[in-house]
């Protein structure tokens, strides 16, 4: 029986969350492509330069912008939440590549999960905090 050489490519993963969004991120050595749910990142994020800049930010800080392909499975929430979840997932994956990256990413704030979520609506109120108009008489 012949033994086959299987070429293994290093895959680094990280999970990011923001609001209601969850992004499972895989970093693969490559040329800097962003693929979100099987769609190129530029078209998925509606060609918004802000969303793309947020998603690539951890790689840009470390100077690794065109060295890794980013494959993302994002679900829940909207584009803002998903873009921030991708950023957190990429930052966590970069920490698994090299633990020395942690100090740089931590000082930039990319490893901090944003705890702000939508506040629930309370009964007797119109929204979470908006009360109906008060009439004294």
Swiss-Prot record:
Keywords for this protein: Chloroplast, Plastid, Ribonucleoprotein, Ribosomal protein
A Gene Ontology term for the protein's cellular component: cytosolic small ribosomal subunit
Region (Disordered): 106-137
GO biological process, one term: translation
Domain of life, source organism: Eukaryota
Compositionally biased residues, Basic residues: 118-137
Pfam families per record: Ribosomal_S9
Subcellular compartments: Plastid, Chloroplast
Family indicated by similarity: Belongs to the universal ribosomal protein uS9 family.
Name of this protein: Small ribosomal subunit protein uS9c
Record organism: Pyropia yezoensis (Susabi-nori)
């Amino acid at each position: 029986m012949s033994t086959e050489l299987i070429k293994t490519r290093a895959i680094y993963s990280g999970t990011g969350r923001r609001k209601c969004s969850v992004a499972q991120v895989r970093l693969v050595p490559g040329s800097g492509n962003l693929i979100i749910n099987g769609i190129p990142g530029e078209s998925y994020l509606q060609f918004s330069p802000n969303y793309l800049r947020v998603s690539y930010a951890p790689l840009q800080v470390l100077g690794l912008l065109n060295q890794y392909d980013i494959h993302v499975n994002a679900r829940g929430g909207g584009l803002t939440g998903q873009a921030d979840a991708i950023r957190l997932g990429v930052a966590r994956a970069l920490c698994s590549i090299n633990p020395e990256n942690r100090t740089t990413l931590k000082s930039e704030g990319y490893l901090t999960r944003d705890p702000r979520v939508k506040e629930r609506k309370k009964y007797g109120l119109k929204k979470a905090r908006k009360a109906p108009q008060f009439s004294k008489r």
